[in-house]
Every structure is written in C-alpha cells, then in structure tokens.
Curated annotation (Swiss-Prot):
The keyword Cytoplasm does not apply. InterPro entries: AAA+_ATPase, DNA_recomb/repair_Rad51_C, DNA_repair_and_recomb_RadB, P-loop_NTPase, RecA_ATP-bd. Belongs to the eukaryotic RecA-like protein family. RadB subfamily. This is DNA repair and recombination protein RadB. GO terms for molecular function: ATP binding; ATP hydrolysis activity; ATP-dependent DNA damage sensor activity; damaged DNA binding. GO terms for biological process: DNA recombination; DNA repair. It comes from the Archaea. Involved in DNA repair and in homologous recombination. May regulate the cleavage reactions of the branch-structured DNA. Has a very weak ATPase activity that is not stimulated by DNA. Binds DNA but does not promote DNA strands exchange. Pfam families: Rad51. SMART domains: AAA. Keywords: ATP-binding, DNA damage, DNA recombination, DNA-binding, Nucleotide-binding.
Length: 225
C-alpha cells in the first residue's frame, strides 16, 4: 500500500499549490534558474517554516547567505529560529562532499529539511578537462544520490538549487549537472524572472503534477508570496 508522503509548506501559496500541497519528503527537489530568480529566497523561507513547525533545518550554503535577508524573512523571532538551523559553509567541492556526508549523523536529531544552495557552484570550477569533468560529474551524482537515499531512509525533505547554462541548440537556459542529476531529482522546478520582483515557477518534472504547469509569485521585503 502506497503511503502518503509528508509535505513541507513554504508559505508561498502559489508555489505550494503548484506542488500539490508543498515540498515532498523522501525525495530530492531541484530548483534551478538564473541568478536572482528567487532560489535562495525560497530555500531560506523553507528552512524558517520548517523550524516554525518544530523541526530543525540543515542548510549547506555555497553562495554566501545574507544575514540581513534571513532576518527580513524570519521577522522578530529571527534569533530564536536561527538556533535550529544548522549551517555548513563549504569553500570547495571537496568540503561540500564532507558537509553532505555529515548530514547523515545530524539528520537523526529531529531534522525536517536538508537544503544545498547551490549544489553546483563549486562543481562548475572543477570542469577543467574531459577527465576531470567525468570524475566531477560522478562525484556530484554521488553527493545528490547520497541525499536522495537519506531522504528516503529518514523521510526528510531535501531541496537543492542548481545554476543554469545557455544551450545554443535550443536557445534556452538549462540546468547544470547533466542527465544523472535530472534522474536523481524526482521534482524539478524552473524559476524565471518576469518583471521587477515578479517570478514564474514551472514544473519540469514531478511524479503527480503535470509538466509545464506554472504559477506566478512575488519576491517581497519579507519573503516570497
């Protein structure tokens, strides 16, 4: 009998509705889009909402989190909420691997979400030549595969963000990481800029929601709405 997976609400109503009730536990959700499209804002809000529900959040930060932005979204209880967000700040792809492995020990401590923002920031720097590219792709797949296994074993929400590249053939932006990363991610959401503060989220891949379905949301002073 198929069990109903728990979902984590982001408090961005259009996005939660797009995903059929929130971010699903037990799988990896990938969010990709160009710089400034709202990836980190969504991740911060997810971590904050997770803590508000009485659980801890793990946040692997490779982009450089803004403490001011966190305070804006978390509001007057920012200091208290921050106590239940475990932050890793790797400075290389190798350190990112160590942080990912470390989540297994910590995830037993009432953790509701693991976030990697971004999973591919250091990965891009490792793509020097063909041999190292193959090795690095395999390593990225291993990292995200490890998180997928952990998500299933502990029934945790796992969210990774991904950067994009310009695909000349299709004249469109595509996520970095190749087919293996796409395969491991059971839900994939693309974010697009549509105006000042206005964004569109589109489902690229989902187990129960139609691909190509979109929603509009706004980045405001106190989060994504």
């Amino acid at each position: 009998m198929k069990t109903i997976k728990e979902q984590l609400l982001s408090s961005c109503k259009p996005l939660d509705e797009l995903l059929g009730g929130g971010f699903e536990s037990g799988v990896v959700t990938q969010i990709f889009g160009e710089a400034g499209s709202g990836k980190t804002n969504i991740c911060l809000q997810l971590a904050i909402e997770c803590v508000k529900k009485g659980k801890k959040a793990i946040f692997i930060d490779t982009e450089g989190l803004s403490a001011d932005r966190f305070k804006q979204i978390a509001g007057e209880n920012a200091r208290k909420i921050a106590q239940d967000i475990i932050i890793f700040e790797p400075h290389s792809f190798e350190e990112q691997y160590s942080a990912v492995r470390e989540t297994e020990k910590i995830s037993t401590e009432n953790v509701g979400v693991i976030i990697v923002d971004s999973a591919t920031a250091y990965y891009r720097f490792e793509l020097d030549d063909e041999d190292s590219s193959i090795r690095t792709r395999r390593e990225l797949s291993n990292q995200i595969g490890f998180l997928h296994s952990l998500a299933r074993k502990r029934d945790i929400v796992v969210v990774i963000t991904n950067q994009v590249y310009s695909d000349i053939k299709s004249n469109s932006l595509k996520p970095i990481g190749g087919s293996s990363l796409e395969h491991i991610s059971k839900t994939i959401i693309q974010l697009e800029k549509t105006g000042t503060g206005s964004r569109r989220a589109k489902i690229w891949k989902h187990r129960s929601r139609p691909e190509g379905t979109t929603c509009e949301f706004t980045i405001t002073a106190d989060g994504v709405r």
